[in-house]
Amino acid sequence: MEYARLGDSGLKVSKVILGCMGYGSPEWQGWVLNEEESLPLIEHAYNKGIRTWDTADMYSHGKSEEIVGKALKKYNIPRSRVVILTKCYFGVDDQGNFPSPLSTGRQNEGDYLNRVGLSRRHILEAVDASVERLGTYIDVLQIHRLDRETPREEIMRALNDVVESGKARYIGASSMAAWEFQTLQNIAIRNGWHKFISMQNYHNLIAREEEREMIPYCLDSGVSLIPWSPVARGALARPWASRSTLRENTDAGISILVRARESESDKAIIDRVEELADKKGISMAQVAIAWSLSHPSEYPIVGLNTKDRIDEAVASVQVKLTPEEIQYLEEPYVPKAIHPGER
C-alpha cells in the first residue's frame, strides 16, 4: 500500500480507503455484512496496509461505527496506526432498530426533530455519539451532506469547535455543489477557523460531472478527493449483463444512481473496462480503482466484502494505466444530469 497527504494537511492516508458502509447489520440493507463477518475483514485490510477507514453514524444506525471500534480492541490495533473518518448529518435510530436509509432519518421533523442536519446542537450531539461508539477520537469528521436550512456560519463554527475540543482532528465534506463548498471554506478562512481538507464526492468512470467544477476547485485550493463508489456500486466491477449479485438486488442506491440513468454510453464504458481488464489479466474493479488513482490527490473509498477483494484493491495501487488506456476508457462518456442523491 502507498500513502499520501490528505489535502493541505499533514495527515497521511492510504491511497485506497476502506469503506465501512458494508459492515453493520443486514437488517439495515440486505447486502451488509454482520459483525462476525466484518471484523476479520477489517483486520485483514489493516494487515495489508489499508490503514484508513471511512464510516458514518447513519451506516446501520451506528452499528458500523461500533464494529470499527471493536476491531481496534479485538485485534489490539494501536489507535495511532489508523486513520478513522466518519460523518454526521442524517438521523440515527435510537431504539435499536434498523429502518431503511430511504425511509427515515432524512427530514428534521417528528421523532427526528433536531436529530437531522447540521445545526450546532446536532453536530455536537452526533460527534459525542460517534466518539462513544468508536471508543476513540475521530481523525476526519465529514459533513455527510449540506444542511441548506442551517446558517452556514453556524455549521462552520460548530465544526471548528469540534476540532478545538479534540474530538476530531480535521474536517471534511461530502456531496454538494462546488459553489456551496467554496462558500463554507470562505467562511472558515474569513474567521480563521479550521478548513475542510477533503471532499467525498461521487466520481467514477460512468459519473464524471464533478470534473466540471468541484474537482478543479478542490485541486486549486488544496483539498483532496476521496470519492465514494469508485466502482459505481459494483456496476464497473462486473460485465454489463451481470446483475444477479446480492447487492444488485438489495441496494437501492444501485437502481437510483446507476440503473435509472444508465445509457449506451455506460454500456460502452463498462465493456471497455472488461476488455482492458482481460488484456491486463486483472479484475474490472482494479481497472476502475486504477482509473480513480490516476487523478492527482484522489484516493477512492472502496467497499470490500471478502479478503480476496481486499487483496485486489491493495494490488490496484500498482496498476498504472497509460494515457492511451485512460483516454480509451473515458472516450464514450456522455454527460449526465445530477441526481439529488449526489447533493
From Swiss-Prot:
InterPro entries reported in the protein's UniProt record: AKR_Detox_Biosynth (IPR050523), NADP_OxRdtase_dom (IPR023210), NADP_OxRdtase_dom_sf (IPR036812)
Pfam families: Aldo_ket_red
Residues at the active site: Y59
GO molecular function: hydroxyversicolorone reductase activity; versiconal hemiacetal acetate reductase activity; versiconal reductase activity
Chain positions recorded as substrate binding sites: H144
E.C. number: 1.1.1.353
CDD domains, per database record: AKR_EcYajO-like
Transmembrane parts of this sequence: none
UniProt catalytic activity: (2S)-versicolorone + NADP(+) = 1'-hydroxyversicolorone + NADPH + H(+); (3S)-versiconol acetate + NADP(+) = (2S,3S)-versiconal hemiacetal acetate + NADPH + H(+); (S)-versiconol + NADP(+) = (2S-3S)-versiconal hemiacetal + NADPH + H(+)
Keywords: NADP, Oxidoreductase
Ligand binding (NADP(+)): S229, P230, V231, A232, R233, G234, A235, L236, A237, R238, P239
First-tier enzyme category under EC: oxidoreductase
Site (described: Lowers pKa of active site Tyr): K87
Phenotype of the disrupted gene, per the record: Aflatoxin production is not inhibited, while the enzyme activity catalyzing the reaction from versiconal hemiacetal acetate (VHA), to versiconol acetate (VOAc), which branches from the main pathway, significantly decreases.
Source species, domain of life: Eukaryota
Similarity annotation: Belongs to the aldo/keto reductase family. Aldo/keto reductase 2 subfamily.
Summary of the function given for this chain in its UniProt record: Catalyzes 3 reactions: from hydroxyversicolorone (HVN) to versicolorone (VONE), from versiconal hemiacetal acetate (VHA) to versiconol acetate (VOAc) and from versiconal (VHOH) to versiconol (VOH). Probably not an aflatoxin biosynthesis gene: may be involved in the vertical branching steps connecting the main pathway from HVN to VHOH with the side pathway from VONE to VOH.
Name of the featured protein: Versiconal hemiacetal acetate reductase
Organism expressing this protein natively: Aspergillus parasiticus
Encoding gene, per UniProt annotation: vrdA
